[in-house]
């Protein structure tokens, strides 16, 4: 086995530790029949409340249906509650994890929190597409027009009470 034969694009590749097919079945890249090349990398930023993190986990199965060969990285303050068998990389919200995600590239990055640190993190992440809430001109901003309504209803109680959208 040579380094040039390592399949770095495989969903099972962990980098610093042996992959699951190697651990369980002694597979090595150059002869592995379980190679699962990553086509899409998604970062989910959901730092906040425990209940909110739990309520957003159905996104994982939805994205898996939309994007075959998906690799999900999720950064949160509650890493222990996320389904480890459905998310490739679960990171605690700390300096090391922020450093890691801001030095990688993603196809899609989604920030579901309106907290400043989450918004600034999305702004700093390298992603082809960004959704949710970001940071621009020293304040929270919508990453796409679809997030604008949610921001407005969050800014003003009276508009939120009149809200007919979800």
Question: Regions from the language model: what does each represent?
Answer:
Residues 1-166:
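Catalytic machinery of carbohydrate-active enzymes
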């Amino acid at each position: 086995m040579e380094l040039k034969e390592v399949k770095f694009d495989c969903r099972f590749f962990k980098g610093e530790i042996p992959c699951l097919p190697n651990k369980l079945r002694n597979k090595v890249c150059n002869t592995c029949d379980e190679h699962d090349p990553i086509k899409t990398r998604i970062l989910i930023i959901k730092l906040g409340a425990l209940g909110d993190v739990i309520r957003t986990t159905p996104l994982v199965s939805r994205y898996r249906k939309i994007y075959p060969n998906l690799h999900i990285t999720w950064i949160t303050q509650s890493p222990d509650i996320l389904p480890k068998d459905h998310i490739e990389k679960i990171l605690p919200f700390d300096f090391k994890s922020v450093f890691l995600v801001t030095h990688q590239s993603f196809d899609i990055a989604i920030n579901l929190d309106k907290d400043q640190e989450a918004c600034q993190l999305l702004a700093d992440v390298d992603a082809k597409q960004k959704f949710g809430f970001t940071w621009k001109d020293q304040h929270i901003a919508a990453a796409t027009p679809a997030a604008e309504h949610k921001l407005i209803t969050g800014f003003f109680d009276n508009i939120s009470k009149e809200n007919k959208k979800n």
